[in-house]
Swiss-Prot record:
One of the components of the core complex of photosystem II (PSII). PSII is a light-driven water:plastoquinone oxidoreductase that uses light energy to abstract electrons from H(2)O, generating O(2) and a proton gradient subsequently used for ATP formation. It consists of a core antenna complex that captures photons, and an electron transfer chain that converts photonic excitation into a charge separation. Pfam families: PsbK. One of its GO terms (cellular component) is chloroplast thylakoid membrane. PSII is composed of 1 copy each of membrane proteins PsbA, PsbB, PsbC, PsbD, PsbE, PsbF, PsbH, PsbI, PsbJ, PsbK, PsbL, PsbM, PsbT, PsbX, PsbY, PsbZ, Psb30/Ycf12, at least 3 peripheral proteins of the oxygen-evolving complex and a large number of cofactors. It forms dimeric complexes. It is a single-pass membrane protein. The gene is psbK. This is Photosystem II reaction center protein K. It comes from Chlorella vulgaris. Keywords: Chloroplast, Membrane, Photosynthesis, Photosystem II, Plastid, Reaction center, Thylakoid, Transmembrane, Transmembrane helix. Residues 1-5 form a propeptide.
Length: 42
């Protein structure tokens, strides 16, 4: 996170987006697991 701390102030509004980015693949994985479970149980 040291790189993000060195960004200019102009990028400050984008900090929440950068914080959320690592969570998106996990959400897709969970969505895939739930979809597979619903299809297999049906």
């Amino acid at each position: 996170m040291l790189l993000l701390a060195k960004l200019p102030e102009a990028y400050a509004p984008f900090d929440p987006i950068v914080d959320v980015l690592p969570v998106i693949p996990v959400l897709f994985l969970l969505l895939a697991l739930v979809w597979q479970a619903s299809v297999s149980f049906r």
